[in-house]
Amino acid sequence: MWEHVKKVDPEIYEVLVNELRRQEYGLELIASENFASLAVIETMGSVLTNKYAEGYPGRRYYGGCEWVDRAEELAIERAKKLFGAEFANVQPHSGSQANMAVYLALAQPGDTIMGMSLSHGGHLTHGAPVNFSGRIFKVVHYGVNLETETIDYDEVRKLALEHRPKIIVAGGSAYARTIDFKRFREIADEVGAYLMVDMAHFAGLVAAGIHPNPVEYAHVVTSTTHKTLRGPRGGLILTNDPEIAKAVDKTIFPGIQGGPLMHVIAAKAVCFKEAMSEEFREYQKQVVKNAKKMAEEMKKRGYRIVSGGTDTHLFLVDLTPKDITGKAAEKALESCGITVNKNTIPNEKRSPFVASGIRIGTPAVTTRGMKEKEMEEIVELIDYVLSSITDEKGTVRPEVREEVTRRVRKLCEMFPLYRDKIEGVEI
């Protein structure tokens, strides 16, 4: 593998090998990351990358699209079947572009949209001032109840009645609880708004049937195809409304994108096929079991979990009682081979670049085959590292760093990722 890269560009070959080693021997706990199958990876690295295919299957602006049409048709049909939707657009290059397409299809610049505050668990594209969504549209943010740290639906309704948004967005990037889509739809209908659900984080759980399906309630649903879906990096839009589908298709192309990434779309098709298997369903069940187990074990060790736990693949740890910043915790853990990300918490007092919490997710470690027993050990290692931080920069005592790094590697060796599947590369 990569023998041609090695010959043509040794520097990039070195990057590939070192990143492969990092993934193979490190514990990946970033909630938005996962490990794609070799089938998905091979499809992304295929000759399909050579083909321009502006337009849609059967309606292209280029000739020679017979086989890429077939790939996109498979991706569309599988996405529709997987999520129970009448229409699917598989061309968005990312979740952010999927969200942008929906906004521009259903609203005009200057219209009001409503989404969850970033500091309460939302996403940049849900109206953050630094993002296109916050610059193009007037934004009203809702948040969580500071006592329960769960969505305050009464506040959502109150804000919706007051501001009459064109679009209400449900979903987030750091919200660990199941969202009541039915309640959101009732609020949207009451004020004449479109309900858009961004299920980027929990799409895999939905595909497996272990999480409520927003397609049943929302006017339109967006997602990424990586994260819990375990596919290539890309976006997806679903709807049951033919008029919305037409508007979305026109907004994606020619509105905000040109040529689709056919190698990625084909890899999405592979991902959707994998997600239809019983093995995938069992995997998603274990993802949630592992997240719940980790949250419970963290609580036993004195850590405060935002909202008290999780219903999904992720949870937030408030490090304020431990007098550790999220930035320091992230750096300390990374120095020992454990990757998480710093994250703001509800009622955050620090800058997002420092933050008071960390976000932990289990999709990637579960892909390796790890279960509850391993989650206990991982929590033990996390606690050991965080208890050994010596300064605000996240420096860890050398002897602790060496011990934890060794134990992390040993654990990863017991649950190999690509090591036994890739030939020609010394890992």
UniProtKB/Swiss-Prot annotation:
Whichever gene encodes this chain, its name is glyA
Q: In which pathway does it act?
A: One-carbon metabolism; tetrahydrofolate interconversion; Amino-acid biosynthesis; glycine biosynthesis; glycine from L-serine: step 1/1
Q: Which residues carry this modification: N6-(pyridoxal phosphate)lysine?
A: 227
Name the residues that bind (6S)-5,6,7,8-tetrahydrofolate: 118, 122-124, 243, 351-353
Keyword hit for DNA repair: no
Identify this protein by name.
Serine hydroxymethyltransferase
Which HAMAP family does the record associate with it? SHMT
Q: Which UniProt keywords apply?
A: Amino-acid biosynthesis, Cytoplasm, One-carbon metabolism, Pyridoxal phosphate, Transferase
Q: Where is this site: Plays an important role in substrate specificity?
A: 226
One Pfam family it belongs to? SHMT
Q: Does the keyword Amino-acid biosynthesis apply?
A: yes
* Function description: Catalyzes the reversible interconversion of serine and glycine with tetrahydrofolate (THF) serving as the one-carbon carrier. This reaction serves as the major source of one-carbon groups required for the biosynthesis of purines, thymidylate, methionine, and other important biomolecules. Also exhibits THF-independent aldolase activity toward beta-hydroxyamino acids, producing glycine and aldehydes, via a retro-aldol mechanism.
Q: Which organism is it from?
A: Thermotoga neapolitana (strain ATCC 49049 / DSM 4359 / NBRC 107923 / NS-E)
**What InterPro entries does the database record attribute to this sequence?**
PyrdxlP-dep_Trfase, PyrdxlP-dep_Trfase_major, PyrdxlP-dep_Trfase_small, Ser_HO-MeTrfase, Ser_HO-MeTrfase-like, Ser_HO-MeTrfase_PLP_BS, SHMT-like_dom
